[in-house]
């Protein structure tokens, strides 16, 4: 795809410069046009009582199949769309893993999680996490360890391996961003996946 064509189709007021692409992309005219086209027949996906419902259901199922194909997922994988961005996806994951607890419930139970944290799951986060991928864990039923930066500005792999080795007998969840939205430095996901498999950890 031509970068100049991409720039021409970005929705942004003239004279404004945007530097947060890793976190949130801007509106893009071809995508917005496609959304407008789909909205012409938009309806509930859990209904089969109208042609519009069938059309929207097909959009949804085709999108799911496309994601699974692109990520090379097998039939034993499930996709759980949240519809409200990555922050909602993190919360959904925490609910499934038994980590998320509503603040009012936490206050009502009055449990001192610090006193039992070693019996809770260990969540490993990276040095360049968005707040939604760190603060929400710190308020949940888990212990959180943050891996520091290496000299090259990326993930400190030696420290990660050390933490994994020390906690090998615990339930471990690795929730590390694929890239820093400040520097743009990418995490080596193949190395991260290999480290997780070595110690039986789950990647969020």
Role assignments for model-derived ranges:
Residues 1-204:
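Pyridoxal 5′-phosphate
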